[in-house]
């Protein structure tokens, strides 16, 4: 019996050590509606909420969620946030709702979610939850007939770098790490129970074409394109400022290296004279000399995040432009006929 128990425990520990990678986030339709309702009601204010569910193998099931209250005072948020979450967990437990935290959701404006604050929140969740996700919802895309819902997690390689706090160019080249390796997008699968699916089938009308289908044919997306261009220009300015920081760093580094070479040449000449006089040579390095003090290299994390945002805005502009061209060609063909 003891041998069987020991084998069982070894099998459990082995399964826990070799956890399958996360392949899909399965979210209930009710949770999706709650997220959309919360983000839409407070738009353009950014809001967040807690995700509840189960971690089953390679699938992360999100069965429910609840919103976090919106407060202006950061100190008030810190004081009341923990108590609010505990009270909500207790209430959900009493009504037999899954109360296991699997991550959080948050709204965004035009997909500009790649920030240091998001990474810090991820790392805080990672202390207690090994596999947590963040579901991002963009209410601004709802007017275009798009359900802008995506699930994100931090890559393992990025978390290793972040814990080490080393985002220098040498370290990034050693790890072969680029700005595209920060986030991993997990596919989302929306699921409903059989009763809900049957009920939705009953509610579905027999009309083959709805007003939403006509709305998707509208080519007027001027505000969306303008906002994307405005955000893109701002990101390019921020990226230019980051590049100026690195240019300033490399100028100082080159100046320091030139000063070090001049100092070493002078010291070697002095040592040759001392040897000729029969005196002990002086050390060629002087740690007390300011020119030998290492200049700290700026972190590349901020520039990587800004590059992520630039790529996101370019992708959105490209997508909307492509859709509008398709609509224009369709309209032209109908007009010609």
Curated annotation (Swiss-Prot):
This is Eukaryotic translation initiation factor 3 subunit H. Residues 267-278 have a biased composition (Basic and acidic residues). PANTHER family: EUKARYOTIC TRANSLATION INITIATION FACTOR 3 -RELATED. The modification Phosphoserine is found at residue 178. One of its GO terms (cellular component) is eukaryotic 48S preinitiation complex. Residues 25-158 form the MPN domain. In response to auxin (NAA), phosphorylated at Ser-178 by ATPK1 and binds to polysomes via TOR signaling. This phosphorylation is repressed by Torin-1. Transmembrane segments: none annotated. The gene is TIF3H1. Residues 267-290 are annotated as: Disordered. Signal peptide: none annotated. Keywords: Abscisic acid signaling pathway, Cytoplasm, Initiation factor, Phosphoprotein, Protein biosynthesis, Translation regulation. Changing residue 178 to D: Phosphorylation mimic mutant, up-regulation of uORF-mRNA translation. SMART domains: JAB_MPN. One of its GO terms (biological process) is abscisic acid-activated signaling pathway. It comes from the Eukaryota.
